[in-house]
Amino acid sequence: MKKLIQTIAVAAMMALAIVSCKKNQETIADEPQETVKNADKVLQYIKDLGFPAESIVDNGNEFVVEEDILFPKNMVVPFVTEGPKTEQYYTGSIVNSTNKLNIRVFIDPSMTSMTSEINSGIAQWNGVPNSTLRFNVVTAAPYDILIKDENLGSGTCGQGQFPSGGSAGALIKINKSYIAGNSFAQRARTICHEFGHCISFRHTNWAARGESTATNVPGVTGTDASSLMNGGQCNSGATVLSTKDKDATAALY
């Protein structure tokens, strides 16, 4: 009798284990489908912002446009109410009035050797007149932006995410070894530029680079050769925010 009870108990445990494994397998199977569905939404959102399909690069867990703008496939897609936004210097999705007052930046250990450059880039955005936009470095979670080193290959100095859901873009990748030989001012410029993407700015020189069409931030007109947000100018571009960069920041924030 005792042996029979033990046999039944073992059988029950095996059945439970099989059911548990099957349930876990079903959960795992569902997750990729949800990821694919959200990736499709993100892809459509990018197109709605005005980026042509041929400019969108699938890079595994994210989409990349204009070489240094990131859209994670798992991002929360903002609700677009006005149809395609085909012409703009910014995405139309900005950091909200509460979050802009304290955008918390966490420096990954891989980037601590460039802390001074990061602080320099932050100081430029924090110093814009008539703007309440503020970045602050924090040493632990919670944080809004993670800045880390990543090998992005030759020709790409950094990448940054656009804002989503009222929060700043959550990630900046810096190709640290690639820009290490640049001057301090140019390294800080790269980092400052990527912070600009995190608060919604696109490349000021989009037309010259053949990127998707854009219009000015309201009240800030014309091209700007001095803009720090010009793309394709790693190690050669402006190292300080131009007057128009500052005017655009004040207009949005």
For the regions a language model picked out, list residue spans one by one.
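Catalytic zinc-binding patch centered on the HExxH motif and its immediate surroundings
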Residues: 114, 146-171
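Active-site scaffold of zinc-dependent metalloenzymes
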Residues: 159-183, 225-234, 251
